[in-house]
Design a protein with these regions (language model features):
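Glycine-rich anion/phosphate-binding loop at the beta-strand->alpha-helix junction
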Residues: 192-195, 222-225, 230-315, 319-323
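Short beta-alpha connecting loops at secondary-structure transitions
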Residues: 65-70, 95, 134-144, 177-181, ...
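Catalytic alpha/beta active-site cores
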Residues: 1-233, 251-254, 258-265, 301-306
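Short, acidic/polar
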Residues: 27-36, 282-290, 407
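Flexible, glycine-rich loop/tail regions that form catalytic "lids" or insertion modules at the edges
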Residues: 1, 316-317, 321-328, 332-473
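A glycine-rich phosphate-binding loop feature that marks nucleotide/adenosyl-phosphate handling sites
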Residues: 51-52, 101, 127-133, 171-179, ...
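Conserved, mostly hydrophobic/aromatic
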Residues: 41, 77, 118, 244, ...
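Mobile "lid/hinge" segments at catalytic clefts and subdomain interfaces of large enzymes
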Residues: 131-134, 149-206, 283-364, 370
């Protein structure tokens, strides 16, 4: 281990895409934040939508009250999408959209905006998260039952494969599973079971020619978590890489090695960020980032880091800049990208990877025996396993068996100048919500009601007939 020759600097590995997860208040305010972050060296966008947008409610719906713009940007129509990407050329951008239950419609708005900018759809690069299965297990922003949700996911995949070949139509999310308490084995197995369920649905639909199925597989990406158990996380990512290669080759017959690559982006663990002594979170975030970048054979291709104070509230631009600079320092000031895989040949790493793979395969067999991931969700099995794991995690912290610095050990502290300021986090004003509602009312008043009715009827027909819902969206 570590005895590989130094790589020629001309053969440096390319840095991953630098992102920050951002969006709040209004589309215009979020656009200003995006352009500011891009000017600081960020190389991709990661859009956070507010809860009404994630669950299909317009900003003026009674259930949206108090949530508009609070944890993300509100988008109700193409006008909001225009404001969100004002002066940002979509043909030159790599955009990740954290959207699931309403992914088809948010992607449709993005494509419509690209059409307005005369950007060929084939040139668009980015990702729709579009993993509705994990919504039943962790986040809860689902709209439809599991089976119809799987149909929506399938439609987006089939549409982008033909129209947007550089787009990742789905980010299979193990990230949220870990946030909900998943063990590394559960994170591996549950995420891979979701990917299998989706690919099986695409193949069974009869809407994808066999010779095109490899293209579908090749565009599936993953959104992975990385916690502080450093060695285990490195091994988990290597296990993901090896298991995905096996599944795509053996189950789906994909012969192109490039299409079998485990392509993933990452946000490091937010669950472990603490309100107590939040300055310690800087060290946590940096260590977790190392777990997804050190191992070249399983290195993330896109990274977004939470800000140190996200346990307290929405981060300020300065806080997001701090996280961005951590990525840039690692990529450009260290020699990390000049070497091959520094863990290759390590018996410790190999043994742990083998252990994780074997346990994940056993869990995958169990899920398959239940009828697959949808059945495992409907039965409550997957949710029950996550709840049990999370209870064990919390109990270990409360008993002091799992040490969390500043929480259950080393709790004496000085006052922090970082959190003493009155505006140490961003707050969303009530005026942001009222202004959004006023703009939405004006938009509705100006549109052609006949065109609206015709568009909704076309979408309704597609939904009922089984046709792909993306074109009429």
């Amino acid at each position: 281990m570590g005895d590989q020759p130094r790589r020629d600097k001309s053969l440096r590995d390319k840095p991953w895409i630098f992102r920050t997860y951002a969006g709040h208040s209004t589309a215009a305010a979020s656009n200003e934040l995006y352009r500011k972050n891009l000017s600081k060296g960020q190389t991709g966008l990661s859009v956070a939508f507010d809860l009404p947008t994630q669950t299909g409610y317009d900003s003026d719906h009674p259930l949206a009250k108090g949530e508009v713009g609070k944890v993300g940007v509100p988008v109700s129509h193409i006008g909001d999408m225009r404001a969100l990407f004002e002066a940002i050329p979509l043909g030159e951008m790599n955009t990740s959209m954290t959207i699931n239950a309403t992914a088809a419609w948010l992607l449709a708005l993005y494509v419509a905006l690209a059409d307005e900018q005369d950007v060929p759809r084939a040139k668009l690069q980015g990702t729709t998260q579009n993993d509705i299965i994990k919504e039943y297990l962790s986040r809860g922003t689902y709209v439809f039952p599991p089976a119809p949700s799987m149909r929506l996911t399938k439609d987006v995949i089939l549409f982008t494969t033909k129209e947007m070949p550089k787009w990742n139509p789905m980010n299979v999310c193990s990230y949220h599973l870990q946030e909900a308490g998943a063990t590394p084995v559960q994170e591996l197995a549950f995420a891979l079971a979701t990917a299998i369920g989706v690919l099986d649905a695409v193949r069974a639909s009869g809407q994808c020619a066999p010779e095109e199925f490899g293209d579908v597989v090749g565009r599936i990406s993953f959104f992975v978590n990385a916690g502080l158990r450093f060695v285990t996380e490195i091994c988990k990512l290597r296990a993901f890489t090896e298991l995905w290669d096996e599944i795509t080759r053996e189950r789906y017959g994909v012969t192109d090695a490039k299409q079998r690559l485990f392509r993933y982006g990452v946000q490091v663990n937010s669950l472990g960020l603490t309100e107590q002594q939040p300055e310690n979170n800087v060290a946590r975030i940096l260590l977790e980032m190392l777990a997804v970048t050190l191992s070249k054979d399983a290195r993330a291709r896109a990274v977004q880091l939470p800000a140190w104070n996200e346990a307290l509230g929405l981060p300020r631009p300065f806080d997001q800049q701090w996280s961005l600079r951590m990525q840039q320092i690692l990529a450009y000031e260290t020699d990390l990208l000049e070497y091959g895989d520094v863990f290759a040949g390590s018996p410790v790493i190999a043994a742990k990877v083998a252990e994780l793979k074997a346990a994940a395969k056993d869990e995958l067999k169990h899920i398959e025996a239940m009828g697959g991931t949808v059945k495992a969700v409907e039965s409550g099995y997957l949710k029950q396993r996550l709840v049990e794991s999370n209870c064990r995690r919390i109990e270990a912290i409360e008993r002091g068996e799992q040490i969390v610095v500043g929480v259950n050990r080393f709790t004496e502290t000085e006052a922090s100048p970082l959190t003493d300021a009155a505006e140490s986090v961003v707050t969303v004003s009530a005026e942001a919500e009222s202004g959004q509602i006023e703009r939405l009312a004006a938009w509705r008043a100006a549109r052609d009601p006949k065109a609206v009715a015709a568009a909704l009827e076309a979408l309704r027909r597609a939904a009922k007939s089984g046709a792909n819902i993306m074109p009429p969206s």
